[in-house]
Design a protein with these regions (language model features):
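Hydrophobic alpha-helical
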Residues: 13-18, 22-43, 115, 133-194
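Early extracytoplasmic/lumenal segment of secretory-pathway proteins
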Residues: 1-19
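Flexible loop/hinge segments that line or gate small-molecule binding clefts
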Residues: 31, 36-74, 189-198, 202
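Hydrophobic alpha-helical segments within soluble ligand-binding/sensing domains
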Residues: 9, 66-94, 140-141, 165, ...
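Hinge/cleft segment of the Venus flytrap/periplasmic-binding protein
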Residues: 99-102, 107, 119, 188, ...
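Short, solvent-exposed amphipathic alpha-helices that sit
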Residues: 75-82, 106-126, 143, 167-171, ...
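Short beta-strand segments enriched in small/hydrophobic residues
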Residues: 23, 28, 65-67, 95-104
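Short beta-strand elements in bilobed, periplasmic/extracellular small-molecule ligand-binding domains
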Residues: 1-2, 96-101, 116-134
Length: 247
C-alpha cells in the first residue's frame, strides 16, 4: 500500500519489475505523477492492470493493459439522486453543498459532474458553494471543519472519495453539526458502513464493490497474462448505492 505516496509507489513497482513478475495490479496514486512508474513497468515487458484510479488517458492507451473502473459519471448521478431525495424529503429547496474532492484524478471530476447534473435537475435551487481537495483523511477533516465554519448555513457535504467522506463526517461531528449537516459519500469502508448505519450524519454512499472489483481484476489479469484479452482497455465494474448498511 503506497498510502498516497508517489515515491513509495515507485519503489514498490521497481521492486516488482526487478523480480520480473507476470503482471502488476495497482490503483495509481496520481494521474500524472504515477505515469513514469507505470511506463517503466510497461517498457520492462510487465503488463500493468489499473483499478479504480489510473494514469492519464494517453498513458493508459500506451502503457496500461487494462483499467477497471465504475463509470464515474453514473457513480455521481446515483449519489446526486440520493442527495435530491434527502433534500426533497426535508423540504430544503435551496440547499448549500460543499465538496471535498480528489480531483487530481479525472474520475473524481466526473463523479462531481454526475452528482451536480442530477441534483440540480431535481432540486434547481441547489448550490455548490465550495469545492476543495481533501483526499487523505486528516486533510479532509481539516478542510471540512473550515468549510463548516466559513459557511454557517451549509446543508451538506459531498465526499468524492472514502477519505473525503469519512473526513466530512468527522468534521461535522467535531463542529457539533450532527443532525444539521448531511454527508453524501463515496467508497465503502468498515468505518463508513458504521456511520451509515448510525445515519445521523452520513445519509448515502455510492461504492464499487470490492469483491466485484477484485473478481473482475483477477479475471482480467489472467486474460492479459495468457494473452486472451479482447483489446478493450477500460472495463466497467458495477456500481451500488447504499442508504443504510442492510441495502
Amino acid at each position: 500500500n503506497a498510502q498516497g505516496d508517489i515515491s513509495k509507489e515507485s519503489t514498490f513497482v521497481d521492486t516488482l519489475v526487478a523480480r520480473n513478475v507476470d503482471a502488476i495490479i495497482l490503483s495509481a496514486v496520481s494521474e500524472n505523477g504515477s505515469s513514469r512508474t507505470v511506463r517503466r513497468a510497461s517498457e520492462a515487458g510487465i503488463p500493468v492492470i489499473c483499478y479504480n484510479t489510473c494514469i492519464n488517458q494517453k498513458g493508459v492507451d500506451k502503457y496500461v493493459s487494462a483499467y477497471l473502473v465504475g463509470d464515474p459519471l453514473e457513480f455521481g448521478k446515483k449519489l446526486g439522486n440520493a442527495a435530491a431525495d434527502y433534500f426533497i424529503a426535508n423540504k430544503i429547496d435551496q440547499p448549500k453543498i460543499a465538496v471535498i474532492n480528489c480531483e487530481a484524478f479525472e474520475v473524481c471530476v466526473q463523479r462531481r459532474k454526475g452528482f451536480e447534473e442530477v441534483l440540480k435537475s431535481r432540486v434547481p435551487g441547489a448550490q455548490i458553494v465550495a469545492n476543495q481537495e481533501g483526499t487523505v483523511l486528516d486533510k479532509a477533516i481539516s478542510v471540512g471543519e473550515k468549510l463548516i465554519i466559513s459557511t454557517p448555513d451549509l446543508n451538506a457535504i459531498m465526499g468524492e472519495s472514502g477519505g473525503a467522506t469519512l473526513g466530512a463526517v468527522k468534521a461535522v461531528r467535531n463542529q457539533n453539526q450532527a443532525g444539521k449537516i448531511a454527508v453524501f459519500g463515496s467508497d465503502m469502508t468498515t468505518e463508513i458502513a458504521q456511520e451509515l448505519e448510525n445515519n445521523q450524519v452520513l445519509k448515502a454512499v455510492v461504492d464499487i464493490s470490492g469483491k466485484k472489483m477484485g473478481n473482475a481484476v483477477f479475471a482480467q489479469t489472467l486474460k492479459v497474462i495468457n494473452k486472451q484479452a479482447d483489446g478493450e482497455k477500460v472495463i466497467q465494474v458495477p456500481i451500488d448505492l447504499y442508504t443504510k448498511t442492510e441495502d
